[in-house]
Structure formats: structure tokens, C-alpha cells
Amino acid sequence: MENERKKEHLENFLKSNFKSNTLFDNVYIEHFALTDLNFDEIDTSVNFLGKKLSFPLLINAMTGGAETSYDVNEDLARLCKNFNIAFESGSQKVALQDDELVETFTIVKDILDEKNIIISNLSALSSLEDAKKAVEMLNSDAISLHLNPAQEIVQFEGDRNFKGILENIENIVKNLDVPVIIKETGCGISKKTCEKLLNVGVKYIDISGYGGTNFIEIENLRRTDLDFTNIYGWGIPTAKCIIDCRKISKDFTLIGSGGIKTGEDIAKAIILGSDMIAIAGEVLRYLIHGGYKFAEDYLKSLIYQTKMIMLLLGVKNIEELKQVEYKIFGKLKEICEY
């Protein structure tokens, strides 16, 4: 049943068409005509989880368990290796329940080596024992525990009881041997949520804001008994999440994600306060609709666009990009000033 649900998720993701807004279009950054840089010398490398990446990007696989997942995960892992960027697995819950599905996840270990970054993935409601098993399965550098109450409550067979989730996160953070990333799944991390996570020792937060893959829509497309289309707009826009969470503290790694599709999106997300960027749906669309080369060309374009914007801002590396001044306006300014 879990395997079939994963297959439906992938199919419905490709069917989904609700248009949401990250509010990056409400962020103004200013062109610098006297740029004094050589494009080929612009450095996009970053250190993440103790390893050096060529670009501050994490690809979230989103898949695993379904028959098509093996090929998708294999191609995503190849992309991550070739571009020297990080790979995050889709939820490994299905593989912990069914040994026959483990191979759809472990294929990435045949491609990625100790120089690459692999991140496991489970629900934040998972036990410490399952978290350990998920890390062992992929020999991961870290584990991402996802928060997805909106998805679960719309999902017919989803969780309804979220009691004790913060205490569970704290237990895993304190007792797991690898770093723990806490991530949302498209509805965003608020200031209040971020503060609570930092207070229990979380050092890595993926804000996964509203503006990208909409799991409320994906789950609603599976339902025939109830309709949740009026809730498709639920969530905190990605730009607001980044601004609010970074204001709280600079002493944690902030991963910006949720509807990031272009080099300009990446540049703005970093300027607002992100240390890393995560992309899931956009890469998956290119891969499924056009194949490996299509996805490869998309990532090449994404990196080129980001470097181009860095050149036009007069910054030569990611640390300088973080210092670029910006202005916010429109709806983003309204909802950030409360």
C-alpha cells in the first residue's frame, strides 16, 4: 500500500498545476555596472556537513519505493556526483517496512562515494531506532527529518497524532551519530517553529516554504470523498521564511527551499540568509519529461545564471553574496512587518 501511494505521489506531482508564489519577486537587488570580475574566477563552492561542494545545492529525490524510483534515484545521484552537489533521499519509511524496496534507495551508494554527500530522510515522528537504520542503509552523512502535518492531515491514511514531536526530535538530535536536518515540506518554517527547534539543539533547518511542490494538492488528487482545493494556498512564502528564520540567529545552517527554480531565485535566497539551497520538484520535472540530459542542461543553466547574477552584483564568492544589500516591498514587506 505504501509503495502504491509513493507511485501516486509521483503521478500526481506531474499532474499538479496550482500556481503559488515564493515572493522572491518582492525582493529588489541592484545591478552594479562597474563589476570588476572575471566570470571564470567566480567561486560558488561551499562547505557543508564537513565536505566541499562546488555549488550550494542539495537535490531532494522525493522518490523511493515505487518501481520508477530506482531509475530516478540513479539519475539524480549521477547528477549530484557530476556537479558535486548534495543528494537527499526521499522518505525511507517504505524501505524500512519492505526489504524488497531497499534497492530503490541504495542504488545511490553505487554511484556516490565518500567525497559526496548523502542525506537520509524520514518523518520527524520516526523512532530513534528507525533513524539509525535509515542512516545505516545509505551510509549517510546526515538525516533529514520532515515535518508535514498539512500533507498528513489531507492524506486519507496519514498521521493524525503529532503529540510529542518536538521531544522526539530532541531525542534523535542528542542520540544520533550524524547531524540532523529538520525540514518542512512546502508549508514553511515560521519564526516560532525555528526558535523551538534551535532551543532543542537543532543546527540545520530546511525552511521548505510555500511556493513550490504542493503536497496538499498532491494528496487531494488522491481523494474522492473530500475536497481540499480551498486549502491549496496554505503556507508561509519561502522568502518570508528565510528572512524570519535568519533574523533569529546566524548560528545554524539555513537551507532555503520551496519553489526555487532559477539562478535569480538562488541568489535572492542566499542574499536573504540561506547557506544552502534545496531543489526537488523542478529537477524531477526535467528528468521525467526530458531525461538525464534535459536535467543536466537545466542544472548547468541554473549554475550559470547564478554566477551571472553574482557577476552583475560585483561579488566573487558565496560569502560576499550573503552581504549584498536588498529591499523588500509589496506583500512580502506587509507580512514581514507585523
Give short role names for the model-derived ranges.
Residues N84-L122:
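A gly/proline- and charged-residue-enriched helix-loop-helix capping module
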Residues M1-L49, L53, K331-Y338:
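An N-cap/entry alpha-helix motif that binds or orients negatively charged groups
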Residues I59, C80, I143, I205, ...:
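Conserved, mostly hydrophobic/aromatic
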Residues L57-N60, I85-S89, N116-L122, L145, ...:
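Hydrophobic faces of well-ordered beta-strands that scaffold small-molecule active sites
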Residues M1-N3, K7-K15, V283-Y338:
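C-terminal extensions of enzymes
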